[in-house]
Amino acid sequence: MPSASIKKIIPCSKKDLINMILDIEKYPEFVPWCLSGKIHRKDDRPDMIEMEADLTVGKQFLNQTYTSHVTYYKDKGKILVNNIGGPLKHLENMWEIREINNQSEVHFKIDFEIKNIIYNMIMKKSFDLGLKKIADAFEDRAIKLYTK
């Protein structure tokens, strides 16, 4: 089961970065291998935002759609994502964001397993490179949108 953790300082506000992360339907514009993103349900409460969303990810003939439950805890600056349907046996990822001097310190953790053994083996081999590309894509997008 691949798992990893990345920490970065991104030159934008916590609010802007969180809004970008929660804008799942825009992921195909910048996230590598993301073919579509669709939010099915969104519940914005005073203390949290909860969503259910589909992401279709893949390359060439290998593409799959999975459904996740996304919870943003407003007071903690924390976004939790858990798999609730699709090809993943297990998915947990967490974004923790703290604002420091008008920048955001981001700590991203991910742990997942694909149900299909062959896909799982393929992902394990390219996981580190893929995760770096995705993390860099989020950073590049934030810089493009929020810095001058």
Predicted ranges, named:
Residues 28-29, 36, 41-43, 56-105, ...:
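Hydrophobic-ligand binding "helix-grip"
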Residues 17-21, 27, 53, 70, ...:
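Hydrophobic pocket/interface hotspot
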Residues 20-23, 49-54, 75-81:
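Short Pro/Gly-enriched beta-strand edge/turn motifs at strand-loop
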Residues 114-148:
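A conserved amphipathic terminal alpha-helix motif
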